[in-house]
Amino acid sequence: WMASDLSRLDLVAIQIDGIHIKEELLLVAAVGIDVEGTKHPLGVIEGATESAATAQALLDNLIGRGLDPSVCRLFIVDGAKALSKAIRRTFGSHTPIQRCQIHKARNITERLPKAMQASVRRTLRQAWELDDAEKAQKLIRNLARRLELDAPGVRDSILEGLDEILTVNRLGLPAELRRSLACTNVIENMNGTVRRVCRNVKHWRDAAM
């Protein structure tokens, strides 16, 4: 499977996400989406952390199997900066990257007092649903300003990576398609399968062995 030919797949988007199997073990997986909306598991690679080197190894594997790096595709990632860095280094600085909105909302609300979580989640969802990326960005910046006094540590988290959070809004995609491509949910099904299989593995060996 990890050596299968990818050259005939007409992929328009690729989702990449890390799967934490054990504290010291992470698998980085990729799923492609073609023009018909069909999902294609592309590859999984083992790494100690979700580092640039691990992400680069996965991308190099995909290219070596026929993925054309000159074709512009949307990449959806879980938010790890190392992934975005490796993608842009490999596919070009203008490659569109969408950071998972669900991961982002979870990271923000988990740092808030419970009484504030629902209202912040609603505001973020309202921003995600906007067709106009500039209006969405303004709404999120206003939220960050409102939280500056009540939860000062959360402000930077809200604003961090804001451009990549709104990529699908900026691309002007239809609402239904935008919701599908704004998060890494497609890959979560594959991640769940990998986790179930890995629970039965008693002794892990290096992938090169």
Briefly describe each language-model feature range.
Residues 4, 8-12, 53, 59-60, ...:
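Conserved phosphate-chemistry cores used by DNA topoisomerases
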Residues 1-76, 81, 85-86, 90-93:
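RNase H-like nuclease fold core
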Residues 33, 61-65, 86-93, 111, ...:
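Conserved, well-folded catalytic cores of nucleic-acid-processing
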Residues 21, 98, 203-207:
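Alpha-helix N-cap/helix-initiation sites
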Residues 72-81, 86-123:
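Conserved beta-strand -> loop -> alpha-helix junction used to position metal-binding or nucleic-acid-contacting
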Residues 130-209:
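Acidic/histidine-rich catalytic cores and adjacent linkers
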Residues 106-141, 147:
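Surface-exposed, charged/polar loop-rich segments
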Residues 9, 24, 52-56, 69, ...:
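Amphipathic alpha-helical transducer elements in NTP-driven molecular machines
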